Swiss-Prot record:
UniProt source species: Elephantid herpesvirus 1 (isolate Asian elephant/Berlin/Kiba/1998) (EIHV-1)
Pfam family name, one: Herpes_MCP
Name the record gives this protein: Major capsid protein
Transmembrane stretches, start-end: none
Function of the protein: Self-assembles to form an icosahedral capsid with a T=16 symmetry, about 200 nm in diameter, and consisting of 150 hexons and 12 pentons (total of 162 capsomers). Hexons form the edges and faces of the capsid and are each composed of six MCP molecules. In contrast, one penton is found at each of the 12 vertices. Eleven of the pentons are MCP pentamers, while the last vertex is occupied by the portal complex.
Protein location: Virion; Host nucleus
UniProt gene name: MCP
InterPro entries: Herpes_MCP, Herpes_MCP_upper_sf
Length: 1349
């Protein structure tokens, strides 16, 4: 009967069924549901409006329920889940379910203990996640829908067909949303219980299954996880090694645990093989896997359920019962209940037969090892929706490389000599550039010129913030460098004779921190045993604890020159290579022919029989051309005889004598060979001058020539150590002579034509007299080159400053009976007789005194010198500020150096003139204690008591008046080098190049000329990647508890809104971790992986050098952004921040990845940059300390007496890792707030330097390792209430591993383009290689190799 009525109704509406609809919604619903459901839905439209409004919600809920679950169970994702029905699921917010699990056991020999428990009670908790969707139907559409089936003509039905279409569209869209929502919930829950492969593999390792949560196990966990992460990252992009990919897929299937409840009859093939799990991924990854392993993949039909279980709880059943029922109760019964508004249990359905609760579905299967796995991609679920596919992730990786490292000779070998041939210059020069590839596989190059907007910024060149942080109160027990015992005296006493005796009568003073630093060589400097390491905060400044007013205080002073860096940070070998690099850039040729002259000069200056008469003549001539002409005969005799008989070059201890001999004796009687050597010495000065001019510009900047900013030898503020004529000096310079203020322009003029009795009286006094000569600037520069570069290199500091006591020597040498005779004898013999002392001096020079005519001529020439005699030497103290580019940090700083006015340099201990010479160790270049003790017995006694002080490397104590280590222009590293250098032109070049200044202008000039600036730079860049993950889940690893959908409506005058809600709860059914993920496929690189260097002028917009002209010059030449503190926009930047606007066309290059610079010593170990490491130079990952103990955390991170976790040094870069260092100041937000920065500018370094970020990362990692270590066992042998889900922070570890581990990855890069191109050519040798001074850093994650393919 019912069938007949149904047939009549079908017949009556036949025309409507055949009407061609624009959308195929009806067919779609019919395919997914039984035909009866569709017919009932159509029949229902003929009811009254009241019935429609009442019952539509119930009908739609049932309809969606059926579509939803049939669609889910028809996918391979259904393999992962039990589906259980629970009508009251909305009341189940948190549920606790207990399972009895049988424990498998192995029989053992008798007498061996074995477990007696056959079962274990496992507790699982439910997680509720309701899903919902809403849609609107207009009132007019509903009315049209009603009229279409009630008292309507056929024409009305045709006219209102659009109303039906709209309604069906809403119904279909909402049901489709619930289908997608269910799959999304299941996938999300599976991911929530699926740790990454690198974590799960560690937990399954033999050493990983230790639940003890001590520091050792946490460290082992992190080390293992960090090692495994690069291995599994982007594995499907490494198509060259299919075996490795298959091995990882096999490991993924083997790592997961089985389910507590597995129905072996479900999801089996026709051949009886059971599907063990499902590999869920995206369509891209599935295509890659299919193409790569097509032989292992086939399509097959498997048995799958088409019904869900029912969740039953009762007193009799305290555990869980699963009973299979039909997916949906009978439709008519449900409608009847809804109409009567009565609730009651549903009877068994006659809609579907109970026997048909299983069917077959077609799925892709892959044989991975001995495991059969189903393949599923879910892109179709998320396509064209606003919901993000949880298998698509954004990965953030930070990379590092280094530019400008120096490789010592011990490792300056080649591993690529057979593949790469570079010219000798490039091969052996310190590199000033780094090469790498961007995401388009285009070669990129970064040079020091690209880093200028960091290296020339005021913040980088400023030491005030570092000094402010370094200034502190000394705590009890604080570990201090021994240099803190050095007493800082701002006004030391002048070292007169009595003071000198007192000084050398006491014990030697404590060594300074600078001196102690230079006792360390190579990597010893970076070790915890270096107690001075904490004072190394900035390459351009010296920091030290010192004694001030009998208390420990702090001092910070500019280093002024590159040569003042500690030798461990800029070793002699590096300085020499740098000088050869400058020689190459200057296009000059190494003066090999000069080496003969240099050898002869070395032999002369190291000869203990150096003629002492040379000292007398050089002092009496004192650079005066007329005096030199008067002594012409005497000088010629000394040169010719000394050169002929002793193979020596007299007078080369004095610059002015060399100058006058080379330029004024070309047509004299001097031997041509000897004169050639003097001319070569003079030419060598010119050669060195040209060398250090390399990189300079013409013109002036703030009243100083550009060369003044480049090299200190051109700075008028630095005077030569020996002065005979005052040069033009800066007005802000202060000069003291013998500790008395001196006005050079107001000094008394010498008038040699007038007998000045007052000057004769003051020969040994303190009044300064001068010749009416202003020395030309180029002569002053040449003099500084000779005294600061050539003589130290020739003598290895074995010279000593001295004063000839003319007030004693002249009477004893000339005004005596041997020299002055009665007038009758002069008339008769026509000759001067030399005194005994003068005879000895002449004979020491090889001049014969036996022939009287010659002696008369010589002595006449000698006597004429007395007419232009100077005074005894005066000690000059020159103080003044530095140049404008160096003084912005400490404008009150006054650099100090000392010179001898009309003094000279002793080459060897004097024998004849010992009583007429006063040794003055005024400069560490010229303070040889062996020479000084010959003139001062109290120094000899001092050396006898303290033989360790007999040294010429700056370790010989000199009075505090001369030894002001932190204020002098030249400091200990200079003396260390010149003490041991070879006596060659190369050493002279090195000393000249060591005078290169530390300043932003100098850095710009050097970088522009491709000259190494004296320090390396670590480049740090963060890149973004779109990654597609693989999820593998074992069979039945989760139960999904569903409730009946319920619909409620909100009705207004114009439309009705329907809200459909489905309650879903999930229960993990795994014995342990039953699912695993792997970031397998690199889909695209979001950032450009390029070479866009950070502009610190945007980060710190108001920092200034304190001089408008200098600021403008620096910003203009470096390309820095101009900003003014008075600009309202600048105030807004400091207050609210401002996004860095990309001014270049973004369509060409995409999203830029910003590169930041961390200044680094050139001696930082290269191996540190070849492995994942913290770019600040010291590990920040501290697992032994609870991150909540902030004081302990701070100590472990910044206390460098504790070895670094990674390298077992204290640090690889003290300028970045020490609290208050320049790197810390620039990138640590704790300090940044003191200097005004733009908070909206992205900084890739911030995550490694900011203490807050470090603390958060450590807290997360500490929790992750602890939680996962506690889950290293299964639920049988571990805690029965442990829930095997991903712990909080796992997603951060997957998406931002560099932040969590506090490490960046090495970038494939090389200091030479040839090395890089050779490396990527097949067959590529996967290792980091070196080629003498050049190096190649291999990447740990083979991104470049992926891009290449």
């Amino acid at each position: 009967m019912e069938r007949d009525v149904d047939a009549d109704i079908r017949l009556g509406s036949e025309l409507l069924s055949k009407y061609p609809l624009d959308i195929n919604v009806a067919a779609l619903i019919r395919n997914y549901t039984a035909g009866e459901l569709f017919d009932n839905l159509r029949l229902f439209f003929g009811a009254s409006p009241e019935d429609y409004n009442l019952q539509f919600e119930a009908i739609f809920g049932i309809y969606c329920n059926k579509l939803e679950w049939i669609h889910f169970l028809g996918t391979a994702l259904g393999i992962t889940s039990h589906v259980v029905r629970f009508p009251d699921a909305e009341k189940l917010s948190v549920g606790k379910i207990v399972f009895n699990v049988t424990i498998p056991r192995v029989a053992v020999p008798s007498g061996v203990p074995n477990t007696k428990n056959a079962t274990a009670v496992v507790v699982k908790y439910t997680e509720r996640m309701p899903i919902g969707i809403s849609f609107e139907l207009s009132f007019a559409a509903l009315e049209k829908l009603r009229l279409s089936f009630q008292d309507a003509t056929l024409l009305d039905k045709l006219i209102n067909i659009q109303a039906i279409n709209n309604t069906l569209q809403c119904i279909n869209n909402s049901a489709n949303a619930l289908q997608r929502g269910l799959i999304n919930v299941v996938l999300t829950k599976l991911l929530h219980k699926a740790p990454p492969f690198f974590i799960l593999k560690y937990l399954e390792e033999p050493t990983g299954g230790i639940s003890s949560n001590n520091s050792v196990n946490r460290s082992n966990a992190v080390f293992s996880i960090k090692s495994l992460l690069p291995q599994c990252l982007f594995i499907l992009n490494r198509v060259e090694n299919k075996t490795s990919i298959l091995n990882i897929l096999t490991e993924m299937t083997a790592l997961v645990k089985h389910s507590i409840m597995v129905d072996s009859s479900l999801y089996t093939t026709s051949g009886g093989d059971e599907v063990s799990g499902v590999l869920v991924t995206t369509s891209n990854v599935l295509n890659v896997i299919t193409n790569m392993f097509s032989k292992l993949i086939h399509k097959a039909s498997v048995v799958a359920p088409v019904a869900y279980g029912e969740f039953i709880m009762s007193k009799e059943n305290a555990v869980t019962a699963l009973a299979h029922h039909a997916i949906i109760a009978d439709f008519d019964q449900y409608v009847q209940n809804a109409q009567n508004l009565t609730a009651g249990p549903l009877k068994k359905s006659n809609f579907l037969e109970m026997g048909q609760d299983r069917s077959t579905i077609s799925v892709q299967l892959m044989q991975i090892g001995d495991t059969l796995v189903a393949l599923e991609q879910l892109d179709k679920v998320y396509r064209n929706t606003m919901t993000h596919n949880p298998l698509d992730n954004r990965l953030e990786l930070t990379f590092h490389t280094v530019i400008g490292l120096h490789l010592p000779k011990s490792i300056s070998y080649s591993t690529m000599d057979a593949k790469v041939s570079l010219n000798s210059t490039i091969r052996n020069n310190v590199p000033t550039s780094i090469y790498f590839y961007d995401k388009d596989f285009t070669l990129q190059k970064v040079e020091f010129t690209d880093c200028l907007r960091t290296l020339c910024h005021p913040i980088f060149n400023d030491g005030q913030v570092c000094a402010r942080i370094f200034t502190r109160e000394i705590k009890d027990g604080e570990r201090l460098c021994d240099g803190h015992q050095y007493v800082l005296d701002n006004d030391p006493p002048y070292p007169n004779e009595q003071h000198m005796r007192n000084f050398y009568g006491d014990a030697p003073p404590p060594m300074t921190t600078n001196q102690l630093k230079n006792e360390y060589q190579d990597l010893e400097f970076f070790k915890p045993s270096n107690k001075c390491l904490y004072t190394e905060l900035h390459p351009m400044y010296d920091f030290s604890d010192v004694m001030i007013d009998e208390a420990v205080g702090q001092i910070c002073t500019p280093r002024i020159m590159i040569g003042n860096m500690p030798q461990a940070l800029a070793p002699s070998e590096f300085q020499e290579i740098r000088s050869m690099q400058i020689l190459e850039i200057s296009k000059n040729v190494y003066p090999q022919l000069y080496e003969t002259t240099v050898g002869l000069a070395t032999q002369t200056l190291n000869n203990p029989e150096y003629p002492e008469i040379c000292y007398v003549i050089s002092v009496l001539v004192h650079g005066n051309r007329d005096a030199f002409a008067a002594a012409h005969t005497l000088i010629v005799a000394c040169i010719n005889n000394a050169y002929t008989t002793k193979n020596m070059l007299p007078f080369i201890h004095d610059f002015d004598m060399v100058r006058l001999i080379a330029n004024n004796m070309t047509d004299s009687r001097i031997l041509s060979d000897a004169h050639m050597h003097y001319k070569r010495l003079w030419s060598l000065i010119g050669f060195l001058k040209k060398l250090v001019e390399t990189g300079g510009l013409h013109g002036h900047l703030v009243d100083d020539p550009m060369l003044c900013y480049l090299n200190a030898l051109f700075d008028k503020r630095l005077l030569p150590p020996i002065i005979h004529h005052f040069p033009a000096m800066k007005q802000d310079m202060n000069v003291k002579a013998n500790n008395r203020p001196l006005n050079i322009r107001g000094a008394e003029l010498r008038d040699y034509d007038v007998s000045n009795l007052e000057r004769m009286i003051n020969v040994g006094g303190h009044v300064v007299y001068r010749d009416d000569i202003i020395e030309a600037e180029d002569l002053t520069v040449s003099s500084k080159i000779y005294y600061y570069c050539m003589l130290p290199a020739l003598t290895n500091n074995h010279m000593c400053g001295a004063s000839l006591l003319l007030n004693q020597f002249i009477p004893d040498g000339f005004f005596n009976s041997d020299f002055i005779k009665p007038e009758a004898l002069y008339a008769a013999e026509q000759t001067f007789e030399a005194s005994v002392m003068l005879r000895r001096l002449l004979e020491q020079a090889g001049v014969s005194t036996a022939r009287r005519p010659e002696l008369h001529e010589i002595m006449t020439s000698f006597f004429r010198l007395l007419l232009r005699m100077p005074e005894n030497a005066r000690v000059l103290e020159i103080t003044g500020p530095l140049d404008h580019a160096q003084r912005h940090c400490m404008p009150a700083f006054q650099a100090v150096h000392h010179s001898l006015y009309d003094g000279f340099l002793l080459v060897a201990p004097p024998l004849i003139l010992a009583e007429y010479i006063q040794a003055i160790p005024f400069h560490k270049f010229y303070s040889d204690p062996v020479i000084a003790q010959a003139c001062a017995p109290y120094i000899r006694e001092f050396l006898t008591r303290y033989p360790q002080c007999n040294r010429t490397d700056g370790g010989f104590p000199t009075p505090p008046y001369f030894s002001r280590e932190y204020f002098n222009w030249h400091r200990t590293p200079f003396f260390k080098y010149s003490d041991t250098c070879l006596n060659t032109v190369k050493s002279m070049m090195t000393l000249a190049c060591m005078h290169t200044k530390f300043s932003p202008v100098s850095t710009y000039l050097q970088s522009r000329a491709r000259i190494h600036p004296g320090f390396a730079v670590t480049l740090v860049r963060t890149d973004l990647f779109d990654v597609e993950r693989i999820l593998y889940s074992s069979k039945s690893s989760m139960s999904v508890i569903i409730g009946d959908p319920y619909v409620y409506k909100e009705k207004t005058d114009i439309h009705t809104t329907y809200h459909i809600t489905q309650d879903i709860s999930t229960v993990d059914m795994g014995m342990g971790y039953s699912a695993v993920t792997c970031p397998a496929y690199l889909r695209r690189i979001v950032s450009d992986m390029g070479a866009t260097l950070q502009d610190l002028f945007k980060v710190f917009p108001v920092a200034s050098f304190g001089n408008d002209e200098l600021d403008e010059w620096i910003r203009t030449h470096t390309g820095g952004t101009h900003a003014s503190l008075f600009d309202p926009n600048t105030i807004d930047i400091l207050t609210f921040g401002q996004v860095n606007v990309n001014e270049q066309p973004g369509i060409l290059i995409g999203q830029k990845a910003v590169v930041e610079c961390v200044v680094t010593p050139v001696t930082a170990p290269l191996h540190y940059f070849k492995i994942p490491n913290n770019p600040r130079g010291r590990a920040s990952c501290t697992l032994a300390i609870d991150p909540e103990r902030k004081q302990d955390l701070f100590r472990v991170i910044y206390d460098h007496s504790i070895p670094d976790a990674q390298s077992f040094l204290s640090t690889a870069n003290p300028w970045g890792s020490i609290w208050g260092s320049i790197g810390d100041v620039m990138y640590n937000e704790f300090h940044r707030e003191q200097i005004g920065y733009n908070s909206r500018i992205y900084s890739p370094c911030k995550q490694f330097f900011s203490l807050d970020d470090i603390t958060i990362s450590n807290r997360t990692l500490f929790k992750i390792t602890g939680e996962y270590n506690s889950r290293s066992k299964s639920c049988i042998d571990g805690d029965n209430e442990t829930q095997y889900v991903c712990v909080e922070g796992t997603s951060d570890m997957v998406e931002k591993p560099c932040i969590i581990f506090q490490e960046s990855y090495p970038l494939l890069s090389a200091s030479s383009e040839g090395l890089l191109e050779s490396h990527i050519k097949p067959p590529a040798v996967r290792m980091s290689e070196t080629h003498f001074q050049n190096y190649l850093i291999e990447e740990v994650i083979p991104i470049t190799q992926i891009l290449k393919k």
